[in-house]
UniProtKB/Swiss-Prot annotation:
It comes from Conus virgo. The keyword Secreted applies. One of its GO terms (cellular component) is extracellular region. This is Conotoxin Vi15a. It comes from the Eukaryota.
Length: 74
């Protein structure tokens, strides 16, 4: 009976490793194991000119020439 319990504990230790994947560590190997993706990576979007400045979002012009840039995600 004791060898069966030891085998179960060993299999859990191998699956959980040091617990980093369970705790959400930012280690790349942990993210591969859990399937997590980092959503904080900067993404280069197509930028345009809005009111004479570079705008990487939505350019709104409610009153003709009074344009403003609203960045994506804000």
């Amino acid at each position: 009976m004791m060898p069966v319990i030891l085998l179960l504990l060993l299999s859990l230790a191998i699956r959980c490793a040091d617990g980093k994947a369970v705790q959400g560590d930012s280690d790349p190997s942990a993210s591969l194991l859990t399937g997590d993706k980092n959503h904080d990576l900067p993404v280069k979007r197509d930028c345009t000119t809005c009111a004479g400045e570079e705008c990487c979002g939505r350019c709104t012009c409610p009153w003709g020439d009074n344009c403003s840039c609203i960045e994506w995600g804000k």
